[in-house]
């Protein structure tokens, strides 16, 4: 006679099948460099070239937002030299990072990397908004709600690498 399978075991197996194990290498103790390695591997498996190839990397933790620099209380990081094709440079505000879940960290990291590497801008600036969008792409905000799920991140990340979201914009890096 077969032993009955507990519902919790079945639910856990289904959950494990649904969640991409690719992200299991990241946890609350992972470094910015480990997040970068994941980002690079994710870009490559999404069909993009190595986003760091031939570039100087400068990833670091900053302190509380410097409001004079353009970083505001609803921004968890800042990209630098976005028009410099020889670098990828951005900071993550340490106090935000320490309070974030792994999923929030993924969103923030990919958001800042999107500015620094792909020259992505926010789809809208606050002054341009008349209503909230139907979905919030990675480039929408660098801070997402605490209850954001890995599944939501994976969908948004796929759109991120395909450059497929409403309001996609880029920094203008042409020389005058």
Question: Where in this protein do the model-derived segments appear?
Answer:
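Active-site-proximal beta-strand/loop segments in catalytic clefts of secreted hydrolases
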Residues: 60-65, 94-95, 112, 140-144
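Metalloprotease/metallohydrolase-associated module, dominated by Zn2+-dependent proteases
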Residues: 12, 16, 20-39, 48-52, ...
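Short pre-active-site segment immediately N-terminal to the catalytic Zn-binding motif
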Residues: 91-109
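Post-signal/leader-peptide non-cytosolic segments of secretory proteins
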Residues: 60-62, 103, 116
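Residue-level detector of short, conserved catalytic/binding motifs and their immediate flanks
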Residues: 57, 105-106, 137
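Active-site recognition of the HExxH zinc-binding catalytic motif
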Residues: 106-120
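Bacterial Sec-dependent N-terminal signal peptides
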Residues: 1-12
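Acidic helix-start/capping segments at beta-turn-to-alpha-helix junctions
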Residues: 53-69
